């Protein structure tokens, strides 16, 4: 299968970038990583001593889901989605939930079970001020959770690759905790075609 994808690999440590055709990464024997110096590094379970933490982002329709699905099939790889983590952290009984409930107590955004009605919440946070307030609570909590998972997995020493997909990977400075950032690039015409399906 030929994927029309490109990966912009950026080392979170050095900031060096490299554009590569991602189809060359999609092999069954091992994951290949293009290092900042241009060399290819095998990322199979046998060659890695320390867990590698990779952050993935890219535009809508770029092919992130396909890549994440592929990575999930590999031994020693765990995939996390920042959006799913945020939803979990906003459930009743969590610290985030209580802070948000205090902040939006006057708003009609609650389901009968006390959870947020996401559609109503989206209309309330349409203003920059309220959206920034919500993000100021949720985003730090998500990053803290992810950092805890990464630290735990490193200590356990079982996982070889931890992958995080996050829309705001760069804006939220995940380079502070990821070893590498991967930006998935696909031509605009292909992205539009995918979104029309």
Segments (PLM) and residue ranges:
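Hydrophobic anchor at the beta1->P-loop junction of P-loop NTPases
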Residues: 56
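P-loop (Walker A) phosphate-binding loop of NTP-binding proteins
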Residues: 59
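ATP-binding Walker
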Residues: 62
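Walker A/P-loop
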Residues: 65
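Short beta-strand-centered segment that lines the nucleotide-binding/catalytic pocket of NTP-utilizing
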Residues: 77-90
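ATP-dependent small-molecule kinase phosphotransfer cores
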Residues: 87-158
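ATP-dependent NMP and nucleoside kinases share a basic, alpha-helical "lid"
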Residues: 147-155, 162-194
């Amino acid at each position: 299968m030929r994927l029309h994808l490109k990966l912009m690999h950026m080392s979170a440590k050095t900031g060096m970038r490299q554009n590569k055709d991602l189809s060359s990464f999609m092999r069954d024997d091992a994951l290949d990583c293009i290092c900042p110096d241009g060399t290819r590094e095998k990322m199979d379970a046998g060659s890695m001593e320390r867990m590698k933490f990779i952050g993935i982002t890219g535009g809508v329709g770029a092919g992130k889901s396909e890549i994440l699905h592929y990575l999930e099939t590999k031994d020693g790889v765990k995939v996390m989605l920042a959006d799913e983590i945020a939803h979990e952290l906003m459930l009743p009984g969590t610290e985030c939930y209580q802070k948000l409930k205090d902040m939006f107590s006057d708003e009609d955004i609650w389901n009968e079970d006390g959870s947020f009605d996401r559609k109503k919440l989206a209309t309330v946070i349409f203003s920059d001020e309220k959206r920034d307030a919500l993000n100021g609570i949720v985003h730090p909590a998500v990053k803290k959770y992810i950092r805890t998972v990464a630290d735990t997995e490193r200590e356990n020493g079982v996982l070889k690759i931890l992958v995080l997909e996050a829309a705001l990977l760069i804006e939220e400075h995940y380079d502070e905790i990821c070893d590498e950032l991967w930006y998935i690039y696909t031509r605009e015409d292909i992205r539009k075609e995918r979104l029309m399906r």
